[in-house]
Every structure is written in C-alpha cells, then in structure tokens.
C-alpha cells in the first residue's frame, strides 16, 4: 500500500484554545548534542544502520559540460563569415550612423525635472499604490492563530517518515492550511486533545497525546513550533531481552504493545485512558506519569475506547474479540458488563444527546445503537460493505450520524427515533478511509483521513438532502464539562442538564 499521503488519525481543537502567537524552539549547542547522542543510542538499541552516508560526485558529462560553458569565446579571424556583419562607410552615411556618437542625450535635460515629482516610501506598507502584500507579511499573518480559528491535528504516514500536521481551519474566512508539523518517531495510530498541564500550578494547556506502533504514548505541546521531543511520555519501550520472552501482560510501567486508541477524561483532567494491542486498557495518572489501573477484561486487541462525556467514572471499550465492555472505573473488575457482536469492534462513541446510549461499529459493516442498561440493541444498521473506521455524531445536531468506511464511502444518517434513515452517501475518492471527526464548534464540519489525498474537510450542510433533514433541527450546545452532569448507567452526583439550547 502506498503511504505517500496516508492520514491515519485526526482530532479537532476548539476555537480560542491555541496561543495566538506560538512559541518557537531555539536549541543551544549542548541541547543539540544531547539530542544527537540520544538518537544514536536509540538507533544502536534498535539495530540501526551505520552512520556513514554515500555522497554523490559530479558526473564526467556534467563536468565536461561545465568546462565547455566556461571556456571563453575565441576572437574571429580574417575571412570568417561573421566578418560580413561589418558595415561599410556608405551604409553608415545613409542612416547618419557616422554622426551617432556626436548627438547628445535628449532626455538628459529633462531628467532632473522628472525626478522632482518622485516620492520614495520607506516600505511597501507606506506606499498607497502598492496593494499586494509581500510573502513575508502573508507568512506572519498565517503564523498567528486567531480566536475564530480551529486547529485540526492529524497523524500522517509518509513514504520515509511519520509526522503530526497541525492545520488551521477558519470557516468565516474560508481558509485551511498547514500551520506547522511535528516529526514523530513511530507510525501514528491515534490522537487525543487534552488541556491537562502536568506543572504544579494546575494551569491549562494545549496538548495532543499520540498513540503509535510502540507502547509509548507521546504528549506534545501544540503551542510550541519546531519542538523535537514531546513534553512528556507515558510508558516505556520493552528491552530486547523482554521481547524475547514474549510476555503479553501489562506491567506497572505501561503497555507492552502498540497503543491503538486514546480517550481523555474531561471531568478528571489528569486521567487518560489507552487501548492497546496487548489486550488491556490502562488508566493513566498524568500528574504522576504512571498507570493508576490496568483493565484486562478483553481477550484480544483493544481497538477503541471512550470516556462518558458527563460521568467521570464511566468508560466503554471495544475489542477484536467482538465485544464491548462498560466499566465503572471506581471498581472496574467488579463493576463491568459485556456485549457480544458478529464482528470485531472498530469504533465506539457515546451519544452525548442521550447519555445512557452509545454506538458501536464493526468490521463487517454494522452499526449498533445500545442502551447501557439493556442487553439488546435499540437498532442494528447494515451501514457499509466493509469495516466502519469512522463513527461520529454531530457535535450539536441531534440524530445526525456520519460513518466512514474502508469501502471508500462516507454516509450521513438520521438516527432520531428507532429507525435510522440514509440521508446522503458519497465516495470521497480518498481510497480506504481510516478516520473521521466532527468539529466541536461547527456541527456540520467534518474532517476525514484516508489512504490518499491527505486530510479533507467537508461541510455536509452544502448537500441539499442534509439541509432538508437537519437544517431546521434545534442545535444543542454542550455546557461546561465541569458543571454538567446527567443520570447515566452508573448514576450521577448532579442533576444539572448538560445541554443548552
């Protein structure tokens, strides 16, 4: 599979969160030496190649061509054909060319007068006749992040490297561009935005957690440009000796295999949940940088998970073992329940409009709508012909569900009530679709990543059938996460409504 334009995971950042002028990293010589030494040490541990690189040399043909071009022209000898270019005296007289050198410059007298009206400006900004901005000015404006800008962070797998791309999206100005990127050490599989700052002053930040093909979770600061290492990491790589033993169980240090999905607890901000190919879910205490709990309910790779939007203790996860698990994280071993399905679980998501309900998608193309208090699904939807890798409810429009699949299609559904209906279907021309996400501030704006064509943003409200189905539907905006709660599958401490119309 060609990896030249693959986007494997995507996440949005709300308007007004990012720093207006991001900081730029300036490394000292000592820091550069330290980073180089650490990189060499990692390469040696992983059995990297030699440090020697082949250097190219100019070819003989190229050198010969350069010599030919640099050789001076030889003077013409008598009798050469080019001597015919010399004009005789009669021709000079006919055109008065023999007196050409005697004539004065007609513009010489008026040159000084013409300069009298010339105005010189210190810069193009001061010149009223220069209306086009220079490139540097455009770059300065693009570097600033406005309060109305959303950020979109996606993991990209290039042919020879992997990185995070940070895009700026502004619907009002119709702008969408790459702001900066971050070089990654491993293939990215999941991204999750969070604002928890591990510093003691309990401030908020603008961070992105990245799960990859290694057991280590990297957390990067999105307000810093040109950073070469994450702010902090969770977990550690296994040594070669431990790998040879073939142990699959999770240790106190963290996962032992790739991290497939991440979910941040918005109510208890120092908690991050991770799903891994080692069959476990780990709850991380980011203030300590260590696992707080390890959940080993599944018997195969855990591919997806999500915290409840209003209940800090409630978590769901989906696995290759064709099951979904619901946990009460206060006592996960004792308080959990399971649902079994026909296929491997690809995605799970809570319905933030109906907090007792959640959705699950499978690798055989089905979507299930479930009540956490019941064993039977509310409805089963045969949505696609292949695995469903994107499962996203609109951030503000009740009943609007968007699914993305390996069958290359994105489909928009109205799931209000017990009978879902297809509103629109589109081949995105992106090959296999890997991920999707709805903008938290704009309910009809979705981002998609796939096998090719990079990151794509689609305003689904431009489709007439979408406008007919959802255009007049009431928008419900989520209230503050700190003040909002609602009765859910494990009860709640508050009766405040989580929605504001």
From Swiss-Prot:
A single GO molecular function term of this UniProt record: histone H4K20me3 reader activity
PROSITE patterns the record matches: WD_REPEATS_1, WD_REPEATS_2, WD_REPEATS_REGION
Summary of the tissues where the protein is detected: High levels seen in the placenta, skeletal muscle, kidney and pancreas while lower levels were seen in the heart, brain and lung.
UniProt protein name: Periodic tryptophan protein 1 homolog
Known role: Chromatin-associated factor that regulates transcription. Regulates Pol I-mediated rRNA biogenesis and, probably, Pol III-mediated transcription. Regulates the epigenetic status of rDNA.
WD repeats mapped onto the chain: 116-171, 177-222, 247-286, 290-329, 334-372, 376-415, 421-460
Keyword Flavoprotein appears in the UniProt entry: no
Database matches in Pfam families: WD40
Sequence ranges of Acidic residues compositional bias: 77-89
């Amino acid at each position: 599979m060609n990896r030249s334009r693959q986007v494997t995971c995507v996440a949005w950042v709300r308007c007004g969160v990012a720093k207006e002028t991001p900081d730029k990293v300036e490394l000292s010589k000592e820091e550069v030496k330290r980073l180089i030494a650490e990189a060499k040490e990692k390469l040696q541990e992983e059995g990297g190649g030699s440090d020697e690189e082949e250097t190219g040399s100019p070819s003989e043909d190229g050198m010969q061509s350069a010599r030919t071009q640099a050789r001076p022209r030889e003077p013409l000898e008598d009798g050469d054909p080019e001597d015919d270019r010399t004009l005789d005296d009669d021709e000079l007289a006919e055109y008065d060319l023999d007196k050409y050198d005697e004539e004065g410059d007609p513009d010489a007298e008026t040159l000084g007068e013409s300069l009298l009206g010339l105005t010189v400006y210190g810069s193009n900004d001061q010149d009223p006749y220069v209306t086009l901005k220079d490139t540097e000015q455009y770059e300065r404006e693009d570097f600033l992040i406005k309060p109305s800008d959303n950020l979109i962070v996606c993991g990209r797998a290039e042919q020879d490297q992997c990185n995070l791309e940070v895009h700026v999206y502004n619907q009002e100005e119709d702008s969408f561009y790459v702001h900066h990127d971050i070089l990654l050490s491993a293939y990215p599989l999941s991204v999750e935005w969070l604002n928890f700052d591990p510093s003691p002053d309990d401030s908020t930040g603008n961070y992105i957690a990245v799960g990859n093909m290694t057991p280590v979770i990297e957390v990067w600061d999105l307000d810093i440009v040109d950073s070469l290492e994450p702010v902090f990491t969770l977990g550690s790589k296994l040594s070669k000796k431990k790998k040879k033993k073939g142990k699959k169980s999770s240790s106190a240090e963290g996962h032992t295999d790739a991290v497939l999905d991440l979910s941040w607890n918005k109510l208890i901000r120092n908690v991050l949940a991770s799903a891994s190919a080692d069959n476990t879910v780990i709850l991380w205490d980011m203030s300590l940088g260590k696992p707080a709990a390890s959940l080993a309910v599944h018997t195969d790779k855990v591919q997806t998970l999500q915290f409840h939007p209003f209940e800090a203790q409630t978590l769901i996860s989906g696995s290759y073992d064709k099951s979904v698990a619901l946990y009460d994280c206060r006592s996960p071993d004792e308080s959990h329940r399971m649902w079994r399905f026909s296929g491997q679980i690809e995605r799970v998501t809570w319905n933030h409009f109906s907090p007792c309900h959640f959705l699950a998608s499978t690798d055989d193309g089905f979507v299930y709508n479930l009540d956490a208090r019941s064993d039977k699904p509310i409805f089963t939807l045969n949505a696609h012909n292949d695995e469903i890798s994107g499962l996203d409810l609109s951030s503000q429009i009740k009943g609007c569900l968007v699914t993305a699949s390996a069958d290359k299609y994105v489909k928009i559904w109205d799931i209000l009530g017990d009978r879902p209906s297809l509103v629109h279907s589109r081949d995105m021309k992106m090959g296999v679709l890997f991920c999707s996400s709805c903008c938290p501030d704009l309910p009809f704006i979705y981002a998609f990543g796939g096998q090719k064509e990079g990151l794509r943003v689609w305003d689904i409200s431009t489709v007439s059938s979408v406008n007919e189905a959802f255009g007049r539907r009431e928008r419900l905006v989520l209230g503050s996460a700190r003040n909002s709660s609602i009765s859910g599958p494990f009860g709640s401490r508050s009766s405040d409504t989580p929605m504001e119309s």
